[in-house]
């Protein structure tokens, strides 16, 4: 037995020497005893008070009393005890501060209150409540190794734990669902998104979580008395996690398995869509510029469909024209300006149609391979703008289409400036052109439906006549756009993998342990191992503010402003982002 002298001050005039004794009985760390001081008035008589040590469990009353000698039955080293206490306290504080800053940013800056960010705010609420109400009690419970807060608190603590953890996991699922819709169905998402729908998702999360967490009071009332039970080996009461196999199966399916499967499916689908977008850009390198001219313009020849990386007739390549054009374009028909159309995305040219009046007429589709919806058998060229150069590409872009009547064809001119224009032979119908540069990752559509014929595309060969002042840069622009899409795909992929990896690492061990304890009564698990797995699940709530906000530039700016770090970028108001 080893003693550590500690000076304690009983009052202003007198100090006492004390010994902090590490007892070999139950390997317990006990509080110091002070010679000359009588503590028997503070504790019941059935507690043994010796001159040197309080034995953790000696003559212990089986009725819970707050004033019993508090000691740890879990650690036999003061160094390990303090280290664990510091780590658990830091996790709790970080979870509180991180999620508090997320909510403060949403409260202070109204421009952040988009549908996606409202779902992130709901996630922060569940994580914050978990950190405030559950984690402090869990810290004390895991440090001492037994329960000191009474039977009612035990039952309430277990239910609150399940409630907030379930709400947090389903909050992650709603965020994934929101991004899934925005990426895979951008047109529908742009039309249907609203704060009301976000509130509906939030209400569903909490109702479902309440049904899961408070089910013991409805269908499993017989197991409630087993939560708070006496452990004879340590002479202490314990608050035991659910062990009923039927309830464990019910809660694990609703709280972990189903949302995990949904999240995995949605993130894989998002990855596939982003990968297809990247492939779409990679394919746009096969058009060649011939030395011949048509009406004084260089001619862009299209490659054969069979010679493109074995893709057959599904997709063909594009050439990208000048990047020095303006940020918008006015569409003119019959010499009259029509400012209702803003062209900021690639336009794809599809199959030849039967010749009419000696010319080959063709249908034009605007399909920038950005929404996972791509048009087969298409050849395309792109007109990037300065606006597109400045903005970050994103996943929420819209597939739009221009259908034209072959019989009513006129000349249409997309006019960039006095010296930069592209003549297209197209015909009438409707034009839907997307804004591919919305920085908030939301889809913004500019729609124009006109009854005027838009012209027709003429030319005896598979070619495009243009007059862009010699600004055609096929190779360099294609490589630049290809690189941008590759980088965007890499960033999005890494972020999705990080989110799923953190979720699986944090919660899957708990899921296996949770199920194993219920089906195997004879399986003995080390108490330190069980506590580490439980806290690993709690850590996910401390990582969520990092994963879902610090990758968002607007949230980073808001955080800097909240803490007073006035960087130059922090002076602008955060804008909505998806």
UniProtKB/Swiss-Prot annotation:
Domain of life of the source: Eukaryota
Disulfide feature: 154-239
Primary location recorded for the protein, binned into one broad class: membrane
SUPFAM superfamilies according to UniProt: Family A G protein-coupled receptor-like (SSF81321)
Location in the cell: Cell membrane
Membrane-spanning residues: 85-107, 118-139, 157-177, 198-220, 252-272, 496-517, 532-553
GO molecular function: dopamine neurotransmitter receptor activity, coupled via Gi/Go; G protein-coupled receptor activity
Topology feature Cytoplasmic, residues: 108-117, 178-197, 273-495, 554-578
Topological category with respect to the lipid bilayer: Multi-pass membrane protein
Record's GO cellular component terms: plasma membrane; synapse
Pfam family, one: 7tm_1
Glycosylated residue positions: 13, 38, 46, 59, 231
Function: Receptor for octopamine. Octopamine (OA) is a neurotransmitter, neurohormone, and neuromodulator in invertebrates. This receptor induces a long lasting opening of voltage- independent chloride channels, a process which seems to involve protein phosphorylation but does not require either cAPK or PKC. The rank order of potency for agonists is p-synephrine > p-octopamine > xylometazoline > B-HT920 > norepinephrine = clonidine > epinephrine > p-tyramine > phenylephrine = oxymetazoline = mehoxamine = dopamine > serotonin > histamine.
Family (UniProt): Belongs to the G-protein coupled receptor 1 family.
The protein's name in its UniProt record: Octopamine receptor 2
């Amino acid at each position: 037995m080893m003693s550590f002298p500690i000076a304690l001050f009983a009052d202003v005039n007198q100090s006492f020497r004390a010994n902090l004794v590490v007892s070999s009985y139950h390997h317990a760390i006990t509080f110091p005893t002070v010679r000359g001081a009588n503590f028997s008035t503070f504790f019941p008589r059935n507690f043994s008070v010796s001159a040197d040590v309080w034995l953790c469990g000696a003559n212990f009353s089986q009725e819970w009393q707050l004033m019993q000698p508090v000691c740890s039955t879990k650690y036999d080293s003061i160094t390990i005890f303090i280290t664990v206490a510091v780590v658990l306290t830091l996790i709790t504080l970080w979870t509180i501060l991180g999620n508090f800053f997320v909510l403060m940013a949403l409260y202070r800056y109204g421009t952040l209150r988009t549908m996606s960010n409202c779902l992130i705010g709901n996630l922060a609420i569940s994580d914050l409540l978990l950190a405030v109400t559950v984690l402090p009690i869990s810290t004390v419970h895991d440090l001492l190794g037994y329960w000191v807060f009474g039977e009612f608190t035990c039952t309430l603590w277990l239910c609150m734990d399940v409630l907030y953890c379930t709400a947090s996991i389903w909050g992650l699922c709603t965020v994934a669902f929101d991004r899934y819709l925005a990426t895979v169905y951008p047109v529908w998402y742009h039309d249907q998104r609203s704060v009301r729908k976000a509130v509906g998702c939030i209400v569903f999360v909490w109702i479902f979580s309440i049904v899961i967490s408070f089910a013991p009071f409805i269908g499993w009332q017989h197991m409630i008395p087993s939560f708070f039970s006496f452990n004879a080996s340590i002479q202490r009461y314990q608050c035991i996690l659910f062990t009923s196999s039927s309830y464990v199966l019910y809660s694990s399916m609703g709280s972990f398995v189903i949302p995990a499967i949904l999240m995995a499916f949605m993130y894989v689908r998002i990855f596939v869509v982003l990968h297809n977008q990247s492939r779409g850009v990679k394919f746009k390198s096969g058009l060649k510029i011939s030395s011949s001219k048509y009406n004084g313009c260089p001619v862009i020849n299209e490659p054969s469909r069979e010679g493109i990386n074995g893709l057959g007739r599904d997709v063909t390549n594009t050439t990208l024209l000048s990047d020095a054009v303006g940020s918008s374009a006015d569409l003119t028909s019959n010499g009259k300006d029509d400012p209702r159309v803003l062209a900021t995305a690639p336009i794809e040219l599809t199959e030849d149609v039967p010749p009419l009046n000696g010319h080959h007429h063709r249908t034009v589709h605007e399909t920038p391979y950005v929404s996972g919806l791509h048009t087969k058998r298409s050849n395309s060229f792109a007109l990037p703008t300065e606006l597109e150069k400045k903005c970050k590409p994103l996943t929420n872009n819209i597939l739009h289409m221009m259908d034209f009547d072959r019989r009513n064809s006129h000349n249409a001119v997309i006019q960039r400036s006095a010296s930069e224009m592209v003549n297209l032979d197209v015909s009438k119908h409707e034009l839907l052109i997307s804004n591919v540069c919305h920085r908030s990752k939301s889809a913004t559509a500019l729609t124009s439906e006109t009854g005027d014929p838009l012209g027709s595309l003429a030319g005896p060969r598979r070619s495009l006549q243009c007059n862009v002042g010699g600004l055609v840069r096929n190779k360099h622009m294609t490589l630049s756009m290809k690189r941008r899409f590759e980088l965007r795909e890499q960033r999005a992929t890494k972020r999705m993998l990080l989110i799923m990896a953190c979720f699986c690492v944090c919660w899957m061990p708990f899921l296996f342990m949770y199920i194993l304890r219920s089906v195997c009564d004879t399986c003995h698990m080390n108490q330190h191992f069980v506590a580490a797995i439980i806290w690993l699940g709690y850590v996910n709530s401390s990582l969520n503010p990092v994963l879902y906000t610090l990758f968002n530039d607007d949230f980073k700016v808001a955080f800097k402003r909240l803490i007073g770090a006035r960087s130059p970028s922090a002076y602008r108001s955060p804008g909505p982002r998806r």
